[in-house]
Amino acid sequence: MRNDNPLLILLIAGLLPFLGKAQKCGTRTLDPEIAGFLRIIGYQDLSLEQLRAMPIGQLKFPQIPLLPYPKEDVQRIKVTRDSIPVLVFNPLHKDNLPVIIHYHGGGFISPLVPGLEYSLWQDARNYEAVVFAVDYRVAPEHRFPAAVDDSYASFQWIAENAQRFGGDVNKIVLMGNSAGANLVAAITQRAKKAGIGNRIKLQVLNGLPADLRPQHMESSESYLQNASGYFQTKALCYFAVETYAPEQYNDPEVSPILAADFSGLPPALIVTAEFDPMRDDGPLYAAKLSAAGVKVREKCFAGQLHCLIGALPESKAQHEFVTLVKNAMSDHLSK
């Protein structure tokens, strides 16, 4: 029977773009290489109770292989009056390069561990940029808003001083993985309110936790689908929030999707993965940006884990990620 209800037709038409997005990311089949990665490392889930019982040092310092790179390609500096540690990678040893300010992941608990340095060096080479990696303070020793304060203060300092290290301060990109993506979202809001948001030409949000409220974790489809078994678990997300911001998850600087106004924020590249509890946060945040007139490009990687964990540098997924970032930089840094 035909339905000519105009309100129903409009509702369905309005939902079609979102339904289409939900159907684009894979078929619930884990990439064989990623399945092999989980087998090789002997991955096992930990419950929230087990995480709480573990010595925090075991979670703070993940065992990431130390891959060599030329030490002359990095400078170790401290910035602002708070002496925030920053690593500066310029393997091209050139001037007037784009500036990437990188904020690492780790659930607001892990510092910038040495095992991440090789990938940061590779980023500087891949994107022909100067990469500033910020070692912001982490929980539980330093709870919210310490990480946001350090991240924003570092951005301000780098935006004024990047040329001393070969960077072009007119070509600034903020890039964050997981907790780092959350910090990037907070920084862009602070910068906009301070009248310096236009200094940021692009934000790259990989594995963004946009909504850290418990009720969201209990109702989001991606949290329900990927609660366990895929490296980043719902229990880990809960533990990170209760360690970092146990009572502040309604604050827009903890759950950036709760911000009152998204207009005037920098263009965004938002990357998600099929087997990530936080997968749905990306499209939800992208919808907020798009509705406010912000240019957004989204990509969900089918068959992959949170932040493409386990995908080797030579993998198709990593090559595609690098290409996405290069194209976004080309689009927004040339203006």
Question: Model-derived features: where do they sit?
Answer:
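Bacterial Sec-dependent N-terminal signal peptides
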Residues: 1-27
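Alpha/beta-hydrolase superfamily serine-hydrolase fold, recognizing
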Residues: 25-335
